[in-house]
Amino acid sequence: SNVCFNACMKISSSQKTCQILC
């Protein structure tokens, strides 16, 4: 089975982008 987690990157002082990596 895959282990998944959220990878978040801060792209500005008020914005974040997140994606799920498996």
Curated annotation (Swiss-Prot):
Protein name per its UniProtKB record: 2.4 kDa venom peptide
Assigned GO CC terms: extracellular region
Q: Where is this protein found?
A: Secreted
Which tissues is this protein detected in according to the database? Answer: Expressed by the venom gland.
Briefly state the protein's biological role: Not lethal to mice by intraperitoneal or intracerebroventricular injections in doses up to 150 micrograms.
Post-translation: what modifications? Contains 2 disulfide bonds.
Alphabetic keyword roster: Disulfide bond, Secreted
